[in-house]
Amino acid sequence: MALWRAYQRALAAHPWKVQVLTAGSLMGLGDIISQQLVERRGLQQHQTGRTLTMASLGCGFVGPVVGGWYRVLDHLIPGTTKVNALKKMLLDQGGFAPCFLGCFLPLVGVLNGMSAQDNWAKLKRDYPDALITNYYLWPAVQLANFYLVPLHYRLAVVQCVAVVWNSYLSWKAHQL
């Protein structure tokens, strides 16, 4: 409980920094889970650079982009009524999610040194499956998030749920 209160104080004092660091930490955790539980690499075969890349993506891309998106979305559709939460979820999942995945997957490819041609082929292969999988998880999560969670906690709530999603994304992005 003391850790949660410390997090709340830090979030109140430095919302943007804390949100970005939270996203980075949980993206890194998602990659660790992917490598250890999904891919079963073991500690000897764990790719630390990959984990650091995913954590960096969380801090440098996911945190700022998703955190910024939530602010824009709250400006476009203010309030937390059921109807507004539904509108936010539809805009998020119909507009933002497809664009986000379309940027995230190739960004991982670039950071992994893939050629433009290989990256494009991988995006064409993996994007439809990633987007469909997105729709199994995120509409319900986002509906609850937009209805029940204050704006400054949304990124943290999503990133906690996203530990599972990040594990999937890391696995999907690193499949050859």
Curated annotation (Swiss-Prot):
Pfam family name, one: Mpv17_PMP22
Membrane topology annotation: Multi-pass membrane protein
This protein's UniProt keywords: Membrane, Mitochondrion, Mitochondrion inner membrane, Transmembrane, Transmembrane helix
GO cellular component: cytoplasm; mitochondrial inner membrane; mitochondrion; peroxisome
Subcellular location: Mitochondrion inner membrane
Keyword flag Transmembrane: yes
One Gene Ontology term from the biological process aspect of the record: reactive oxygen species metabolic process
Chain segments annotated as transmembrane: 18-38, 57-77, 94-114, 131-151
Marked site (Determines ion selectivity) residue numbers: 92
Predominant subcellular localization, coarse grouping: mitochondrion
Disulfide bonds: none
GO molecular function terms noted in the UniProt entry: channel activity
Keyword Mitochondrion: yes
Record family assignment: Belongs to the peroxisomal membrane protein PXMP2/4 family.
Function: Non-selective channel that modulates the membrane potential under normal conditions and oxidative stress, and is involved in mitochondrial homeostasis. Involved in mitochondrial deoxynucleoside triphosphates (dNTP) pool homeostasis and mitochondrial DNA (mtDNA) maintenance. May be involved in the regulation of reactive oxygen species metabolism and the control of oxidative phosphorylation.
Listed name of the protein: Mitochondrial inner membrane protein Mpv17
Organism: Rattus norvegicus (Rat)
Lineage: Eukaryota, Metazoa, Chordata, Craniata, Vertebrata
Originating gene: Mpv17
